[in-house]
Amino acid sequence: VGVIGHADRARPLRDYCLGLMMPCERKSVEPMAAVTAPERTAAQHQSLLHFVGEGRWSDEMVLAKVREMVLPEIERHGPIEAWIIDDTGFPKKGTHSVGVARQYCGQLGKEDNCQVAVSLSIANADASLPAAYRLYLPQEWAKDSARLRKAGVPDDAGFKTKHEIALDQLRWACEAGLPRGVALLDAGYGNNSELRADITGLGLTYVAGILSNTTVWPRGTGPLPP
């Protein structure tokens, strides 16, 4: 309760998380209300809508509390071995959810209408735990101040590339003293040479996927001048 501010938010938080895990096609508030409280759907809809849209609580504090509770259990099976950078797409049918746009959705394996979140998970061979999570805000959203205000997005939420978000998360994890692991990145991130250099600058070892047409030069060599 301490991390969400008020005791009366505990029930909506539980119901919202339950709704996200239920096998309903749409993960918006209305269908979630119907499956989590079928006997009082209208009241549940208002409760969840207020919690998600107007309730003030820190997602970072929630993640920190989860990490405090779960990380010791993971480390019982062995030390943290990897920091995994990835993004997750959430298919959407409408246009009002924050950050929704036509973009690549890994869940569908193609471009489609979706939201995308960049995450950093810490893991060993037994389990993984999301340590940082941020919604990617496409430029078409970041440049539309009226759309941002209507959706309740904070004024200081500017545009950042997915690579910049990933680097922010890795830098934060280093500063926060999370147990170190090898940074793992797929080609969507690993093919960015600036990101790889910045990760090295953080003192991290990384294993990164790259595209098959990437040119690689041995250390100390390079292309001849034109």
Question: Each PLM stretch: what is its role?
Answer:
Residues 2-5, 130, 145, 170-171:
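Short, flexible segments with low predicted structural confidence
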Residues 15, 115-118, 164-171:
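Short, contiguous clusters of charged residues that form electrostatic/catalytic patches at enzyme active sites
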Residues 23, 35, 76-77, 176, ...:
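Alpha-helix C-cap/termination motif
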